[in-house]
């Protein structure tokens, strides 16, 4: 156990986050502060209000990235705030089994040993995945701890744990029995690596390709129909060509037939309003088995559906001589063969949008496959109830995006061709019956035999995570709880709906909308009261981070260099609702300097405490603002400013304006308390006891944002030790205070004092007097003021021997005019001529610099050829030079030296 003396010695060396963060975190976690009843001391014997927030479960394969860091930081800020407010708080942690990603990780390890999953078999392979999960999965959990977040770790859930497996089965069977889950042959998005994909798992990219004009000979004619396509390799599956019924060029051909190139198969010419007459030749091929739009056309016109390649993209017998070849690799060979036989009219450059797999980047193929789907009808009530105000989005504009997507919702393909994941709970009896069951090996209701054959596919990962808001609270988990329990019987009643969800806007449709429709459909209740969607974290230039750009920011490196508090505060202060976060070294340095400012303020207060009361005073530390009397004018003023900040921070947190809360704290602690409160205390040493108590309270106010340094400094000022006393994370959060006229008058008093001091310092700087003690300063005030209070602070801080209050401007003086006063210094021995010469020389240099920059920025060639960064640099230089020139001109006017 470390002694107080050792801790004090650490303080003298300077604040080092690495000395504090891991130690304080381990103590708080061990004491159970993060758990639901961790703040029971604040409940005061009453039934507390409940607050719940769900961690978006990161992939078990993942590591902490900067987007995670933002999500978890915001979640932890609001969780700490609610916990300190006395709420019974659940911050639910968890991990996602990440079907495709996890299976691929284990597959690579096995392949490196020369082992395939097929040689192992399904059960043995899944056992290997579980083995990997226990040994290597979940690295991100320890990284979260380094960030300082406080979820109830004892309740950590995994989307493949036994309880959640039961919840998944219950949801599937319930929807299946309601006819909301069906299996059928559908046109799906197909990745040759990852199998079926839902619509939102397809990412569209601009593709610079070709448009091929192919000749399809018209039956019993010497002429050909010119058909335009971007995918010539799919013509083997054509079962028709179509034209617009209003296209005069082709009306006479409707109902006739063409002969398919190379294969010689006869296919009809049909009319369909789907055809865009301006695209290509106005005539397009119809490939119902390999195109989303053609699939619908094929059904409308009863065309055959011919599949030409398998699940891996390999051509089958329907592709003739190209059987056994990969479809994309064969494209140039197919085009060459068509050209050799005179079937290519022309080829043009063409730009279009091509769908790619969101995970592996492969081109996605429309493919007819027997899959399981959740019907879109599950979403009907969810749309209406959100719009009735049962759930609120922050920022509010996300409601429009939610509505637009939900109203265009299609059936959701939920089956995946994997081994790792929630196996679809459908069983096939030898009698031909099909049963959806929550239990394994169910009894067939038709023939009464035990069914042993289960569906081979697993569910989309988003299916299980879509139940996260309530499955983690015990829904569907019956008889699968553990010791210690992962949930309690009353959890759903207390914590559902969840109070708040915080996540990135990029998974609004992947996850948030699906949780909403799942909660509404399965529990008849929306899963959240509020949903806060934050934007992206970008680099300092506003660029999206990517490995290819080399601009990835690793949060663990930031924590190692700056500490978790600096990263948390930086992310929070930059996170305005609806705006991307531009993270830079400069912004991190500002937050780091803030931590140093707090550390130095603590040292100053303790130094003065020791000077005033000796070692005994240091041993007692500073009191709490609720237990001492604040009597000095400075103490009373800083207390009013503290409560003003408290009111504003509380309002910001209640409305999820995290950046506003951080800005208010920064402004108060640095700009008001450190820059003015501590400075003014040099002229009011009796106020030190009061300022120390106020600063302790301010550290509690800041604590949700910067938990480690606030806890450490609070204990230093309190003369206590985290080893033997409670953390401030279970201290009551400062309460709001109603402002009155007396408070406003006190604020105005110190605004005047600060204004006079600032004015005198500005005047001394203009006259190059530096820190020289001035014999006399004349001050003309705009309104009556208590002179003794003014003299007490001004003479000490502005270094003035005599303060003379005047009603008019004295003779032979130079002055400074500000909001509340005019301050004057008699010229006496001041060499105005030397000052004037210096200012005029500076002005000439600046004027030359401005002329040069203006000429450069007005030069058309420079504007045309200069990189953007160079342009911005020169524009900034011009702005700064103009500001300096304006200041010099103002000083010359004030000194009466303008010429």
Curated annotation (Swiss-Prot):
Q: Does the keyword Cell inner membrane apply?
A: no
For the motif 'KMSKS' region, give the residue ranges. 544-548
Single GO biological process annotation from the record: valyl-tRNA aminoacylation
- Residues that coordinate or bind ATP: 547
Q: Any keyword Methyltransferase?
A: no
Q: Where in the cell is it found?
A: Cytoplasm
Please provide, in alphabetical order, the Gene Ontology terms of the cellular component aspect for this entry: cytosol
Chain segments annotated as coiled-coil in the UniProt record: 836-898
**Record-listed E.C. numbers:** 6.1.1.9
Question: In the record, what terms sit under GO molecular function?
Answer: aminoacyl-tRNA deacylase activity; ATP binding; valine-tRNA ligase activity
Keywords of this entry: Aminoacyl-tRNA synthetase, ATP-binding, Coiled coil, Cytoplasm, Ligase, Nucleotide-binding, Protein biosynthesis
User: Could you tell me the superkingdom of the organism this chain comes from?
Assistant: Bacteria
Q: SUPFAM superfamilies in the record, alphabetically?
A: Anticodon-binding domain of a subclass of class I aminoacyl-tRNA synthetases (SSF47323), Nucleotidylyl transferase (SSF52374), tRNA-binding arm (SSF46589), ValRS/IleRS/LeuRS editing domain (SSF50677)
Q: How does it assemble?
A: Monomer.
User: What role is this protein assigned?
Assistant: Catalyzes the attachment of valine to tRNA(Val). As ValRS can inadvertently accommodate and process structurally similar amino acids such as threonine, to avoid such errors, it has a 'posttransfer' editing activity that hydrolyzes mischarged Thr-tRNA(Val) in a tRNA-dependent manner.
- This protein is called Valine--tRNA ligase
* Species assigned in the record: Helicobacter hepaticus (strain ATCC 51449 / 3B1)
Q: Gene for this protein?
A: valS
């Amino acid at each position: 156990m470390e002694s107080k003396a050792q801790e004090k010695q650490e303080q003298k060396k300077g604040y080092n986050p690495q000395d504090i963060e891991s130690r304080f975190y381990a103590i708080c976690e061990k004491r159970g502060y993060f758990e639901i009843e961790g703040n029971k001391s604040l409940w005061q014997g009453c039934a507390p209000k409940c607050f719940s927030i769900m961690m978006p479960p990161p992939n078990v394969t993942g590591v902490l990235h900067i987007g995670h860091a933002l999500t978890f930081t915001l979640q932890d800020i609001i969780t700490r705030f609610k916990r300190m407010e006395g709420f019974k708080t659940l911050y639910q942690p968890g991990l996602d089994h990440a079907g495709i990603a996890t299976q691929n990780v284990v597959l690579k390890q096995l392949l490196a040993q020369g082992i395939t999953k097929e040689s192992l078999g399904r059960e043995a392979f899944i056992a290997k995945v579980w083995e990997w999960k226990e040994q290597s999965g979940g690295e991100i959990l320890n990284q979260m701890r380094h960030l300082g977040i406080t979820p109830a770790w004892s309740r950590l859930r995994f989307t493949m744990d036994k309880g959640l497996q039961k919840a998944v089965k219950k949801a599937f069977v319930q929807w299946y029995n309601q006819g909301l889950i069906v299996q059928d042959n559908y046109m799906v998005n197909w990745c040759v690596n990852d199998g079926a994909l839902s619509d939102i798992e397809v990412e569209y990219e601009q593709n610079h390709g070709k448009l091929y004009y192919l000749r399809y000979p018209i039956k019993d004619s010497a002429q050909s129909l010119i058909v335009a396509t971007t995918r010539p390799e799919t013509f083997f599956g054509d079962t028709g060509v179509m034209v617009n019924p209003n296209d005069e060029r082709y009306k006479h051909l409707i109902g006739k037939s063409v002969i398919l190139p190379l294969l010689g198969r006869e296919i009809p010419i049909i009319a369909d309003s789907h055809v865009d007459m301006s695209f290509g030749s106005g005539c397009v091929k119809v490939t119902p088995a390999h195109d989303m739009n053609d699939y619908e056309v094929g059904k409308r016109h009863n065309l055959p559906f011919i599949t030409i390649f398998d699940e891996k993209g390999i051509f089958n017998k329907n592709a003739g001589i190209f059987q056994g070849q990969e479809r994309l690799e064969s494209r140039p060979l197919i085009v060459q063969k068509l050209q050799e036989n005179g079937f290519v009219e022309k080829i043009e450059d063409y730009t279009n949008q091509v769908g790619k797999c969101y995970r592996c980047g492969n081109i996605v193929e429309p493919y007819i496959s027997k899959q399981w789907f959740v019907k879109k009808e599950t979403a009907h009530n969810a749309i209406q109830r959100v719009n009735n105000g049962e759930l609120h989005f922050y920022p509010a504009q996300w409601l429009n995006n939610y509505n637009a997507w939900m109203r265009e919702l299609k059936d959701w393909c939920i089956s995946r061709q994997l081994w790792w994941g929630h196996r679809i709970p459908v069983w096939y009896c030898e009698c031909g019956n099909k049963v959806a069951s929550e239990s394994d090996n169910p009894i067939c209701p038709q023939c009464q035999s035990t069914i042993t054959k289960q569906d081979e596919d697993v569910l989309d990962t988003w299916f299980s995570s879509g139940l996260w808001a309530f499955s983690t609270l015990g829904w569907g988990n019956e008889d699968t709880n553990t010791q210690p329990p992962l949930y309690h019987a009353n959890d759903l009643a207390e914590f559902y709906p969840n109070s708040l969800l915080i996540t990135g806007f990029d998974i609004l449709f992947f996850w948030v909308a699906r949780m909403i429709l799942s909660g509404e459909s399965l529990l008849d209740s929306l899963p959240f009261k509020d949903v806060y969607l934050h934007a992206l974290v970008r680099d300092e230039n506003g660029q999206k981070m990517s490995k290819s750009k080399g601009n990835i920011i690793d949060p663990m490196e930031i924590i190692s260099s700056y500490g978790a508090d600096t990263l948390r505060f930086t992310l929070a202060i930059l996170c305005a609702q609806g705006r991307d976060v531009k993270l830079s070294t400069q912004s991190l340095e500002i937050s780091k300097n803030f931590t140093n400012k707090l550390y130095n303020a603590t040292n100053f207060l303790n130094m003065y405490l020791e000077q005033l009361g000796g070692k005994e005073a240091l041993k007692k530390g500073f009191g709490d603002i609720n237990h001492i009397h604040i009597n000095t004018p400075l103490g009373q003023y800083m207390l009013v400013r503290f409560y003003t900040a408290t009111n504003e921070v509380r309002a910001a947190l209640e409305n999820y304006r995290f950046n506003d809360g951080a800005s208010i704290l920064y402004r108060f602690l640095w700009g008001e308390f450190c820059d003015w409160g501590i400075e003014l205390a040099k002229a009011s040493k009796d106020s030190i006891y009061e300022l120390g108590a106020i600063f302790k309270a301010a550290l509690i106010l800041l604590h949700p944002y910067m938990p480690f340094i606030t806890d450490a400094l609070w204990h230093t000022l309190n003369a206590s030790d985290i080893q033997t006393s409670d953390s401030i994370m279970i201290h009551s959060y400062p309460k709001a205070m109603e402002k009155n006229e007396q408070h406003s008058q006190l604020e105005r008093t110190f605004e005047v004092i600060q204004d006079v001091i600032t004015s005198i310092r500005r005047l001394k700087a203009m006259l190059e007097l530096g820190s020289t003690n001035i014999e006399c300063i004349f001050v003309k005030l705009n309104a009556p003021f208590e002179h003794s209070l003014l003299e007490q602070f001004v003479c000490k801080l502005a270094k003035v021997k005599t303060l003379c209050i005047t009603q008019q401007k004295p003779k032979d003086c130079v002055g400074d005019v500000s909001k509340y006063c005019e301050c004057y210094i008699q010229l006496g021995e001041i060499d105005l001529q030397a000052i004037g010469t210096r200012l005029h020389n500076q002005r000439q240099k600046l004027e030359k610099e401005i002329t040069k920059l203006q000429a450069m920025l007005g030069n058309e060639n420079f504007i045309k050829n200069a990189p953007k960064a160079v342009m911005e640099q020169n524009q900034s230089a011009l702005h700064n030079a103009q500001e300096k020139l304006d200041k010099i001109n103002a000083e010359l006017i004030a000194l009466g030296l303008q010429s």
